[in-house]
Every structure is written in structure tokens, then in C-alpha cells.
């Protein structure tokens, strides 16, 4: 379940790819709400607006200006939705490849990288995490289909909106039932 600045997936949690609930997941899994974003047409001399409405592309950086103070508000910050000029790394390991030395890490840092998996909590499938930037429409937290902005102009820099998605690597992780369910005592389907 993706909750963030402007995002929430349309499908149910832990539904494998290829099922009816996720057939259009790549196009509609993230969103922006119209109330959250304060946009305005730029009428400044440095950024002239297009003459005709037909010439304008909705969401292009040339005609959407966002107040940078909007991103300082805590309710609009999310680890799953990001505005950036370049794609973010997928994990903490990729961020610290150059400057991380495994000998200098403390025990707590190692424990966070390798969580304990024997606590009775199992994922329904092996997951794949990706950052997606090519969204055009999505479903917001309230269930409304909204249009996602292509580019955003913040302080004269063009930013893209990236959404963090988690999907199942294999649509059927186990032959029968759900992974992590005791088949001797429970009937399940995924």
C-alpha cells in the first residue's frame, strides 16, 4: 500500500502480477491529489507561457511552477514518492557503495541490513522494487483517478516525480496455496 505525497496504489496488497487486480498496475499505481499541489501559470518574463491552450502539454515544466515551501511540510514528505532530477538508487547499499566499508560498520548497521526472518512473518512472494517515473494517471488515497504531472519546475530546475513500487517477481510463487501458510492446518489461495 503506497501512501505518500500524492500516491496510493490502485490494487490490493500482495496481489501477484498478472492477476485481474493488477493488470493495469504499471499505469495506475501512484498518484497526486489536486489539493496537495499548488500550481500557477508563470507569467514572468523569463518563462513566457504558450499562446494557445492546444500548444500546452499538461504537466510540462514550462508551465507548472511549484512553490518549494510545499515540500518542506511534513505531511507531503514520503519515502515512496520523490521529486528529483535523476533516478534515485534502489537501496541503501547502492547509495553507500563508494564510501561504505564493511569493516567499519557497527553491529546495529549490520543487523538493519540483514533482518531476522524467523519471526513467523513471510511475504506472499519474492518482491522486486523499482522506481517508476513514467506515470500519467493514477489513483489517489481517496480512490479518485488523477493525472500525474510529467515534469515540475522548482526554483528554475526541472524535476521528475518518481514512485517506489513493489511487485511480485513470479505471479505464482508456490504451486498451491500461499507461501508462509501452514498447508497442514489451513486452506489458502493467492
Swiss-Prot record:
Pfam families named in the record: NGF
Biological processes per GO annotation: cell surface receptor protein tyrosine kinase signaling pathway; modulation of chemical synaptic transmission; negative regulation of neuron apoptotic process; nerve development; nerve growth factor signaling pathway; neuron projection morphogenesis
SUPFAM superfamilies recorded: Cystine-knot cytokines
Keyword field: Cleavage on pair of basic residues, Disulfide bond, Glycoprotein, Growth factor, Lipid-binding, Metalloenzyme inhibitor, Metalloprotease inhibitor, Protease inhibitor, Secreted, Signal, Toxin
Residues making up the propeptide: 8-111
One GO cellular component, as annotated: dendrite
Residues spanning the signal sequence: 1-7
Gene Ontology molecular function: any one: peptidase inhibitor activity
Entry comment describing in which tissues the protein is expressed: Expressed by the venom gland.
Keyword set includes Hydrolase: no
Protein localization: Secreted
Keyword Cytoplasm assigned: no
Cystine connections: 125-190
Family named by the database record: Belongs to the NGF-beta family.
Subunit structure of this chain's protein: Homodimer; non-covalently linked.
Functional summary from the UniProt entry: Nerve growth factor is important for the development and maintenance of the sympathetic and sensory nervous systems. It stimulates division and differentiation of sympathetic and embryonic sensory neurons as well as basal forebrain cholinergic neurons in the brain. Its relevance in the snake venom is not clear. However, it has been shown to inhibit metalloproteinase-dependent proteolysis of platelet glycoprotein Ib alpha, suggesting a metalloproteinase inhibition to prevent metalloprotease autodigestion and/or protection against prey proteases.
Protein name: Venom nerve growth factor
Originating species: Agkistrodon contortrix contortrix (Southern copperhead)
